[in-house]
Amino acid sequence: MAKGHTKRSYSQRYAKWQAKFNAFSNPTVASTILSNVAPVAQQNFQTNVPTFTAVNENVSAVLSQYGITGPNRAIYQGFGLKIARALNRIGSGPALVNMINGLKSYYISAFNANPQVLDAVVNIITGSPTGYVS
């Protein structure tokens, strides 16, 4: 599941800030924060779950095509989620290409990942084997 920064509107950011700010005037800060922030967090979760579920399903299909089984699937699933998060955070363009190239180098050297499979994962997520979407 996605962790970290996802695109949020200013009204979503303000709603979360207001819920946290109002909670600090209450002696039971932790429970108040959680109860006030829960609706905003649930909405964000429901908004982003379909995107990242689709990424997992699409990457899984690519891995099946390449015959990758067992624990090695986790390597490529993790790579796919990182690419999807980067696309969600920074959008397409040169910054995404740089991020993808860095992640590919890391996954190849650290996990001995197959560059062809990594390219296929990038292609299924961004629509381009290089990650550059114009």
Swiss-Prot record:
Main location: virion
Top-level taxon of the source organism: Viruses
Record flagged with keyword DNA-binding: yes
Pfam families: Sulf_coat_C
Keyword Metal-binding in record: no
Localisation per UniProt entry: Virion
GO terms for cellular component: helical viral capsid
An MF annotation (GO) of this entry: DNA binding
Keywords of this entry: Capsid protein, DNA-binding, Helical capsid protein, Virion
Domains as described in the record: The N-terminus projects into a DNA groove.
Protein task: Self-assembles to form a helical, filamentous nucleocapsid. The capsid proteins wrap around the DNA and maintain it in an A-form by non-specific desolvation and specific coordination of the DNA phosphate groups by positively charged residues. This certainly protects the viral DNA under conditions such as the extreme desiccation of its host.
Subunit structure: Homodimer.
Protein name: Putative capsid protein
Native source species: Sulfolobus islandicus rod-shaped virus 1
